[in-house]
Amino acid sequence: MSRFVAIFSLTLALSAAIVAQEHSPRRPPASNPPATPAAIDNDGGWVRFNSDIGRFSVLMPEIPTDKTETTPSEHGPYTTHLFVIRHDPNVYLIGWVDYDPSFNFNRQSELAANRDNFVKGIKATLVSTRPLQIDGYQAIEFVAETADRTFKSRVYMVGRRPYQIVIGYPKDQEDQVTINRFFNSFKIKPS
C-alpha cells in the first residue's frame, strides 16, 4: 500500500508540475540562478545540470526548479524529488523517490507502476511502452498522449531508487533531436 502511495505521490507531483508549467507564464531567466544542489556549465545553448543529491547529470534548456517533499508512511518516510522547467513549447521533468531502507519492492513492478500512475495522473492514453537496458540499468520507455500533448518518458531503476524523466510537447511539434538530446544526456553518477 505505501509503495502505491509513494508512486502515486511522485505521479501527482509530476502531473501537477506539468499542469502548472503549461498554465503559467514562462518566467524570465534569472540574472543570478537560484541556489540549487547542482553545478552548471553551458553546453551548446543548453545547461548541464548536475545534481549531487540526485547523483545524475542532464542537459536542459535552463536550470530547473526543485521541489522536495518527505512523506510519512506505514513503512517509513519516503522523499520525492522533482526538477521541472517549461521551455516553450516543451516541459521537462526529472523525478525520483528515496524509500525508507526497510521498504522492499519488486523493481520490475516499480517501473510499470510509475508508468501507469503517470499516465493516469495526467489523464493520458498509453500509446507504447518498451523495456530497455540503459547504461546497465533496468528501464522502460513509454509514450502517452492527451488531447493536445505527447509525453515521452523513461523510468530507470538504480539500486533502490526509481528515476523518471519526461519531456512533454504539443502533438504536432515532435522534435526528435531535442528529445534525444534530453534523454541521451541523462547520466547516473556512480555512488
Where are these regions (language model features)?
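Positively charged n-region of N-terminal signal peptides that target proteins for export
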Residues: 1-4, 21
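Compositionally biased, proline/threonine/alanine/serine-rich low-complexity intrinsically disordered stretches
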Residues: 14, 20-46
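Surface-exposed amphipathic alpha-helical segments
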Residues: 52, 61-66, 109-125, 163-191
